[in-house]
């Protein structure tokens, strides 16, 4: 892929993340995205088929970033730095699905898909992960039912709670 396409894709992804911080994903159109990114619709369609394709690529890149992180405090701290990106992935339901696949690979011992970490790490932190998915489910439902203002109001508090749980449970 040439530099121009890479630059266009980055611009599109950045614009979608920014737009998703302003309104719900379901309310974003390709037209809105193109206007925000300062690109033509043909540029968008030369790179993606739909907004869901953009989300899928953002998700793949995000999962690549978090693979290999320790599945406790380090992991949850990384979530606080990726607010708008994570909001988009949680709102669309992609984060939970992709993270579930990652855990499945980890538990199955498919080390080709897991950079660092062991099945023992997951087993030791299974309570933390259980609570994490519960909190992410609540955030996802709040976002869908009430919009992003509720999500933003509870996200940092939820992450703090997860980090606290992680610290407590990892001592058990």
For the regions a language model picked out, list residue spans one by one.
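Short hydrophobic/aromatic patch on the recognition helix
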Residues: 38-47
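Basic, helix-initiating cap at the start of DNA-binding domains
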Residues: 1-23
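Hydrophobic alpha-helical connector segments
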Residues: 67-96
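Amphipathic alpha-helical packing segments from all-alpha helical-bundle domains
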Residues: 94-139, 159-167
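Short, basic, alpha-helical segments at the C-terminal edge of helix-turn-helix-like DNA-binding modules
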Residues: 29-30, 58-69
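The alpha-helix within a helix-turn-helix
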Residues: 34
């Amino acid at each position: 892929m040439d530099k121009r396409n890479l630059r266009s894709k980055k611009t599109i992804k950045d614009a979608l993340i920014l737009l998703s911080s302003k309104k719900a994903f379901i309310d974003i159109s390709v037209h809105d995205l193109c206007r925000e990114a300062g690109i033509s619709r043909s540029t968008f369609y030369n790179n993606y088929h739909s907004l869901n394709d953009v989300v899928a690529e953002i998700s793949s890149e995000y999962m690549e970033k978090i693979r290999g992180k320790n599945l406790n405090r380090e992991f949850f701290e990384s979530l606080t730095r990726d607010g708008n990106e994570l909001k988009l992935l949680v709102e669309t339901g992609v984060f939970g699905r992709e993270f579930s696949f990652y855990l499945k690979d980890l538990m199955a011992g498919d080390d080709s898909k897991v950079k660092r970490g062991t099945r023992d790490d997951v087993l030791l932190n299974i309570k933390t992960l259980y609570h994490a998915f519960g909190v992410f489910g609540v955030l996802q439902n709040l976002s869908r039912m009430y919009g992003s203002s509720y999500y933003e109001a509870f996200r940092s508090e939820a992450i703090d709670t997860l980090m606290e749980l992680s610290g407590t449970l990892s001592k058990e």
